[in-house]
Design a protein with these regions (language model features):
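Amphipathic alpha-helical interface elements
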Residues: 1-159
Length: 159
């Protein structure tokens, strides 16, 4: 993405800067795929992207350049939902991932075991995936053990 709208003057350093994060991430993914000795395809480049990439992709400045096309991937996006809601969910998932990576508690509130945040995030992620591919959750349920583990742990807490 080399559009002029991605160039701005950084007030702190008083220099023109180009926001080429998306371009750099795509090129990095292509290089990584090629180094594995496999054909670089659109699907592989997409699969290689991080939550940071998707967060930037759905930010206003990049989204506007693509004239709303990124939302078309969400075949079952609920009425009234759009770029902002999608990006808000990506941010929440990224925050959850970061909390887990930094060993922060996700199942405790006031030193008591509480799975409400985890359950809410599970529902949010499940819904999000369903908006892209409605048949995904029945397929994932065969290998998904999240709800069973939460139920088991909640039952332990009640004893």
């Amino acid at each position: 993405m080399g559009d002029s709208s991605l160039t701005y003057t950084n007030k702190r350093i008083k220099k023109k800067v180009t926001n080429d994060y998306i371009l750099k991430e795509v090129l990095k993914a292509e290089k990584k795929i090629a180094e594995r000795g496999v054909k670089v395809t659109t699907g592989r480049v997409i699969a290689e992207q991080t939550l940071g990439f998707w967060n930037s992709f759905y930010e206003t400045h990049h989204y506007a350049l693509l004239a709303g096309e990124p939302c078309r991937v969400f075949k079952k996006l609920p009425s009234g939902y759009g770029r902002k809601e999608i990006n808000d969910i990506i941010v929440q998932v990224r925050e959850l991932r970061n909390r887990i990576n930094h060993n922060e508690h996700i199942c405790f509130v006031n030193r008591k075991c509480d799975f409400s945040y985890v359950k809410d995030m599970y529902t949010l992620i499940s819904n999000f995936l369903t908006w892209i591919y409605p048949e995904i959750m029945p397929s994932l349920r065969k290998v998904d053990k999240v709800c069973k583990i939460i139920d088991k742990e909640e039952n332990k807490q009640k004893q």
